[in-house]
A protein has these predicted regions:
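Contiguous, structured surface segment used for ligand recognition
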Residues: 1-113
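Aromatic-lined carbohydrate-binding surfaces of glycoside hydrolases
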Residues: 7-8, 27, 49, 113-380, ...
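Short, Φ-rich (hydrophobic/aromatic) sequence segments
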Residues: 19, 75-87, 449-464, 477
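Cysteine-centered nucleophilic/redox motifs
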Residues: 23, 429-431
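Surface-exposed helix-capping loop/turn segments at secondary-structure junctions
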Residues: 27-33, 268-272, 314-319, 553-562, ...
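Aromatic-rich surface patch/π-platform used for binding flat ligands and interfaces
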Residues: 383, 432
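Carbohydrate-binding surfaces of carbohydrate-active enzymes
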Residues: 471-490, 590-591
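Histidine-centered catalytic/metal-binding microenvironments
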Residues: 516-636
Length: 636
């Protein structure tokens, strides 16, 4: 076996090692493969260029060419998929690697349809979990990793502190230690050739010497106090946290400090490919001082981003900038325009869910009024698109990217099967072109492979080629994950998804979409005090047990470790679903006290067994967001 790296970059060295390792597994160490890894244009290796790979291999001999080093790595994994490999999830026993004689012809010329195929850091993680996930991303077709914040201490501490898990001992994590983990994550991202993005929320107070660690959660430095947003007659922390606190962005001191900080930051980290610039998280936290009230928040925001752009350009720094349409900046600026529009692509959250998905329908009615610190939710997906259309017309920026939240917490309503989540996400990716969008940034847990990884697997496949058929992708995934028991497994998960149905447990909200505002009339749980739903939930335990009994008989003869791991996950998933159904049953019968007891049992089981599904299931995010804050929120 001779794998020749003609590019000799860090990424192609990794690609060479990966191809050599897998081919040795498939055909033995002494196989006759002769493959050259090359650039399509030997004079260009730009990580920002669109991905294209050309594979021309016959009987194990030929070339894999790419438009950049990352594209060559993507081409390596595409060739391995052609040979029958399947990359189902991160970690040991997460992939199918069949034996092969490497004979036959592989001719593929693939250009990624969507240039922005982005995964965003969320959930509870450590650097090892993230690096394992990063290894999986190019196998799934993604090209960019976005680390929120300069140092994502908030996500790392959730893991190290083992928040919500009484069975684990908290581990201290200083800001400096989190910064070291961040550097390791950044280095590995670059090794893979993935575009590396940073920031998002959480940069405003860094120029004032305040990081976003525990020391500065709800207090201000003396230097910062005079410069925070003036709201209701005072300047103070908003929402109890500086992460929810804006500055006065018309204040010349603030503007200069932020601009100077960006120059310093990108000089320190010239390897960053992009920075996402978002104002503070939260709502109703924009400055109401006399000067700020002269302009819209979006006009002030564009002026700030222009100042950052000009200063970076003067220093010869050409890192891409990604402004974000978010809360008060949903409305397009009235006067300000980006002076250098080719430097920007705009990130835009979209109001959607796993039932409706994206829509190409035009917004009907009157859009919400833009009134300072009087937050109104975006009514629906067409309204989100109207905001984007207004920004496109006002700024001249061509590239818009959806910031998608399907796999942040909404997918937990489909935790029984993930079938609805997978189909909706795949359909949404196909709709991007009709909506004029250039890709997706998935704001999601890094551990979304429980009970399966079909939603994010299908998303990656569709972002590369939206003409693929979802049914083909689903069958490909299930056959690899569950072997000859794939059909029975799909039927089982589909049935579970019918019993703990996305719509049956999702909050119902009536929304007025006229009059220039969105008024929530009422909000009720469909399953509370609903004996008919109780009858449905009561079927879950027997459904799980009957399937696992059949699956265990099948597993007696199954030898593949990856397939066995898939069924291990289904076992724990089934046990969690039984306990979830028991809690839902008591709530449906109107037994609130007994429901609360069952919820406690559910939480306990999830946390006690966390190590059993560590890489596949974000127990922290599921318990905090879905159980504690949504479905079983006290008082609901």
């Amino acid at each position: 076996m001779i794998i020749s790296d003609k590019v000799r970059s860090e990424t192609t060295a990794y690609a060479k090692d990966e191809l050599s390792r897998y081919l040795a597994q498939m055909a033995g160490l002494h196989n006759l493969a002769r493959i050259d890894l090359m650039l399509i244009d030997e004079n260009e290796d730009n990580t920002l260029s669109d991905d294209r790979y050309i594979i021309d291999i016959t009987d194990g001999k030929g070339t894999i060419k790419g438009s950049n080093s990352r594209s060559i790595l993507l081409g390596v994994y595409a060739y391995l998929k052609h040979l029958g490999c399947r990359f189902l999830r991160p970690g040991e026993n997460g992939e199918i690697v069949p034996a092969s004689d490497l004979m036959g012809q592989c001719k593929i010329d693939q250009k990624a349809f969507y240039p922005y195929r982005i995964e965003e850091l969320e959930g509870a993680v450590n650097d090892d979990i993230i690096i394992g996930y990063l290894k999986w991303l190019p196998k799934a077709g993604f090209n960019t990793y976005f680390i929120q914040y300069v140092t994502p201490h908030i996500f790392l501490k959730r893991w190290h502190y083992h928040e919500l898990n009484p069975y684990k001992t908290p581990e201290p994590l200083s800001w400096e230690e989190a910064s070291e983990e961040t550097l390791r994550i950044e280095a590995f991202t670059k090794k893979l050739g993935l575009q590396l993005w940073s920031l998002g929320h959480g940069f405003m107070f860094l120029p004032f010497g305040m990081d976003y660690g525990p020391e500065w959660t709800n207090k201000l430095s003396e230097e910062a106090k005079p410069h925070v947003a003036f709201i209701n007659g005072e300047r103070n922390v908003s929402g109890g946290n500086i992460a929810y606190t804006n500055l006065c962005y018309t204040d010349p001191v603030v503007k200069k400090k932020i601009v100077d900080w960006f120059v310093s930051y990108l000089k320190e980290k010239p390897y960053l490919d992009g920075v996402v610039i978002i104002l503070a998280d939260g709502i109703n936290n924009d400055c109401e001082c006399e000067e700020c009230l002269k302009s819209t928040v979006s006009d002030i925001y564009v002026d700030l981003v222009n100042a950052i752009d000009e200063a970076l350009t003067a220093e010869g720094i050409h890192t891409k900038l990604y402004p974000c349409i978010y809360v008060a900046t949903r409305w397009a600026p009235l006067k300000a325009k980006f002076k250098n529009p080719n430097r920007f692509a705009i990130v835009a959250p979209v109001n959607s869910n796993l039932k409706t998905g994206y829509t190409t329908d035009k917004f009907q009615g009157e859009m919400p009024k833009n009134e300072r610190n009087k937050y109104v939710p975006t009514p629906n997906s067409p309204a989100s698109m109207k905001f984007i259309e207004d920004w496109r017309n006002a700024t001249g920026v061509n590239d818009f990217i959806f910031n998608d939240y399907h796999l942040y917490s909404d997918h937990y309503f489909d935790i029984a099967s993930y079938m609805q989540a997978a189909k909706t996400l795949a359909n949404d990716v196909q709709k991007l072109r009709a909506l004029g969008m250039k890709g997706i940034m998935n704001c999601k847990t890094q551990r979304s492979f429980f009970p399966t990884g079909l939603p994010i697997y299908a998303c990656g496949e569709m972002l590369m080629n939206p003409d693929r058929d979802f049914e083909d992708i689903k069958n490909e995934y299930f056959e690899a994950a569950f072997g000859s028991f794939a059909k029975e497994t799909e039927e089982y998960l589909t049935r579970l998804g019918e019993l703990i149905n996305y719509e049956s447990i999702r909050i119902k909200t009536d929304v007025a979409e006229t009059g220039g505002a969105t008024a929530v009339k009422n909000s009720v749980w469909a399953w509370r005090n609903n004996p008919e739903m109780a009858k449905v939930f009561a079927q879950v335990p027997n459904t799980v047990d009957a399937f696992m009994e059949k699956a265990n008989k099948y597993l007696i003869t199954e030898e593949n470790a990856t397939v066995k791991r898939s069924f291990d996950l289904l076992y724990y998933h089934g046990e969690i679903m039984k306990r979830l159904a028991e809690a839902l049953y008591e709530g449906a019968m109107g037994n609130r006290e007994e429901c609360d007891k069952k919820v406690a049992i559910l939480r306990d089981y999830i946390m006690k067994n966390e190590d059993a599904y560590l890489l596949e299931f974000d127990a922290y995010l599921f318990v905090r967001r879905f159980i504690n804050e949504i479905i079983f929120k006290p008082g609901t």
